[in-house]
């Protein structure tokens, strides 16, 4: 569970779950522009699965102990991911190359590039969202003249 494929949470017999960064805290959610994950579909399933775990106390990255409503926190995490997917899908009103999509996405979300390293990191953040739009059928891709174009499915 978590933002990276095959990440695990660990539970103890006394009702504590070490969830790491499988969920973002409310404070992080208020500031994050685009939650990171390797695979958006699996990330959403992970967040849903966390709500079914039988723990009363949680240890979260960027927060430490959390004894609040884990269902509510997971829902807020999933809502942000789904919101970003919907916003990014709207960009595909016209055919776009991956680079065009990334550029428009950065403008929409307010991500700025200052260095090449920032560009690469941002593309790593955006790629799973673009891939999820194709996986779930919201968008499709076509190759024309050795260039991949992404389209919104009607």
What are the roles of these predicted feature ranges?
Residues 6-82:
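Metallo-beta-lactamase
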Residues 90-154:
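C-terminal regulatory/interaction regions
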């Amino acid at each position: 569970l978590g933002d990276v494929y095959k990440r695990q949470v660990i539970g103890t017999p006394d009702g504590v779950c070490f969830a790491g960064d499988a969920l973002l805290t409310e404070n992080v959610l208020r500031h994050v522009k685009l939650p990171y994950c390797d695979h958006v579909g699996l990330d959403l399933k992970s967040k849903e699965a966390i709500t079914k775990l039988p723990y009363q106390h949680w240890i979260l990255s960027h927060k430490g102990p959390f004894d609040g409503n884990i269902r509510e926190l997971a829902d807020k995490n999933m809502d942000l991911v789904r919101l970003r997917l919907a916003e990014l899908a709207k960009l595909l009103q016209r055919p776009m190359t991956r680079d065009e999509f990334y550029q428009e996405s950065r403008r929409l979300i307010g991500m700025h590039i200052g260095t090449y390293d920032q560009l690469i990191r941002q593309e790593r953040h955006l790629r799973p969202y673009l891939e999820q739009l194709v996986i779930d059928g919201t968008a499709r891709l076509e190759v024309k003249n050795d260039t991949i174009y992404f389209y919104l499915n009607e």
